[in-house]
């Protein structure tokens, strides 16, 4: 009996299953938990298909998404795995990032090959920045012709190349989720082979704390005799007393200053790090020079922009969204991090209007610059009510 010890130090990676409906995403998810449970019973509970299939609903930025989370461990890693029952749930999850993915297992039925949703999921993975993909060629027990395997594999690799994934290098593993779930030892081995490919081909993500410092400003105070304090939750990186920072966004000029104090729960710290709610005391900055919605950053690491392309999902009427479609030149507010900025929407060519419940790409021109990079999430609001959510896919200027 192989024993792997549970270590909190194991690297943690977030993955998910993507692919066309009925190609076996949920069955594969269940099969992975079963095979890993059989191999390392003290580390892994088995999660049956039924439990994954009745995914609980979550609300992310007002959007209702059905999503299942399972956890499991290989010898070297701890995984959190997301699976969504419906195609619409996948699209919503990938755009809102309700469950962030460091990599994905693309499930393609060997009996069908790539189908329309396979394409859509790969395109979305590219647009929302899922960085790595491993392919599971499912239902391989139902194909006995080597030529069919070769053909399907070729199609999948071409599809990945088309969307700028390294299609020629991506591992393609032949599996039968159903047979593995039924306890067939040979097909069980193929699931372990798949997980080995995931271990080796989906790199550990960079932790938030290792990224360059960024803190969105939520509030600004003036403390007599000490200066100006900005408060917020550190999004990434670390900040030390006496670090030089820039304050950018909403205005044309940036401010460069020094952090003379870091406070948390009224205690002075030497350092604040990702996840901490802190107050930063800024040298020589007047209260009226900074405002909510700007960001404090490590100098030169983020720039403000006004024009970008985005992928968005629009709330349906039932989710509390709009009741009517919107058209070109729609002017809602875009809520980035801590503040709303009005923007003008240009719809893609050939799209006349967008209905509640749709997802679409769009170009947005903001009336004030916002510090952003590709992948940044935002909400679309009308008078404080969320009507959609999206993320930046490309910065124009």
From Swiss-Prot:
CDD domains (UniProt xref): EF_Tu, EFTU_II, EFTU_III
Annotated GTP binding sites: 19-26, 83-87, 138-141
Region entry G3, spans: 83-86
Binding site for Mg(2+): 26
Chain residue ranges for the region called G5: 176-178
Start and end residues of each tr-type G domain: 10-206
Region (G4): 138-141
UniProt family annotation: Belongs to the TRAFAC class translation factor GTPase superfamily. Classic translation factor GTPase family. EF-Tu/EF-1A subfamily.
Role noted for this protein: GTP hydrolase that promotes the GTP-dependent binding of aminoacyl-tRNA to the A-site of ribosomes during protein biosynthesis.
Subunit structure: Monomer.
The protein, known as: Elongation factor Tu
Species per Swiss-Prot/TrEMBL record: Thermobifida fusca (strain YX)
Lineage: Bacteria, Bacillati, Actinomycetota, Actinomycetes, Streptosporangiales
Gene that encodes the chain: tuf
């Amino acid at each position: 009996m192989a024993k792997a010890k549970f270590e909190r130090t194991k690297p943690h990676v977030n993955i998910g299953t993507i692919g066309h409906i009925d190609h076996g995403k949920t069955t594969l998810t269940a099969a992975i938990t079963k095979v890993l449970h059989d191999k390392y019973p003290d580390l892994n509970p088995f999660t049956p298909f039924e439990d994954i299939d009745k995914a609980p609903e979550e609300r992310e930025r007002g959007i209702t998404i059905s999503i299942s989370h399972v956890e499991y461990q290989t010898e070297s890693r701890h995984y959190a795995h997301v699976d969504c029952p419906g195609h619409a749930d996948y699209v919503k999850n990938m755009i809102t990032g309700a469950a962030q993915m460091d990599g994905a297992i693309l499930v393609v039925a060997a009996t069908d090959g790539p189908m329309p949703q396979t394409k859509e999921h790969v395109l979305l993975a590219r647009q929302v920045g899922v960085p790595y993909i491993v392919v599971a060629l499912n239902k391989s027990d139902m194909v006995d012709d080597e030529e069919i395997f070769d053909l399907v594999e070729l199609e999948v690799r071409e599809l990945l190349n088309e969307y700028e994934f390294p299609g020629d290098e991506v591992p393609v593993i032949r599996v039968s989720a159903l047979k593995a779930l039924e306890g067939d030892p040979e097909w069980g081995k193929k699931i372990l082979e798949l997980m080995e490919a995931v271990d080796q081909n989906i790199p550990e993500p960079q932790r938030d704390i290792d990224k360059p410092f960024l803190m969105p400003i939520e509030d600004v105070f003036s403390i007599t005799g000490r200066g100006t304090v900005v408060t917020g939750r550190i999004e990434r990186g670390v900040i030390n007393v006496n670090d030089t920072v820039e304050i950018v966004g909403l205005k044309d000029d940036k401010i460069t200053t020094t952090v003379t104090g870091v406070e948390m729960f009224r205690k002075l710290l030497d350092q604040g790090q990702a996840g901490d709610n802190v107050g930063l005391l800024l040298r020589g900055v007047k209260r009226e020079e900074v405002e909510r919605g700007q960001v404090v950053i490590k100098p030169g690491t983020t720039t403000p922009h006004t024009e970008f392309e985005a992928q968005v999902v629009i709330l349906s009427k039932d989710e509390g969204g709009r009741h009517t479609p919107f058209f070109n030149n729609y002017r809602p507010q875009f809520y980035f991090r801590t503040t709303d900025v009005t923007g003008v929407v240009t719809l893609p060519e050939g799209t006349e209007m967008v209905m509640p419940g749709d997802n679409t790409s769009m170009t947005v021109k903001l009336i004030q610059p916002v510090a952003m990079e590709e992948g940044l999430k935002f909400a679309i609001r009308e008078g404080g009510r969320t009507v959609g959510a999206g993320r930046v896919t490309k910065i124009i200027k």
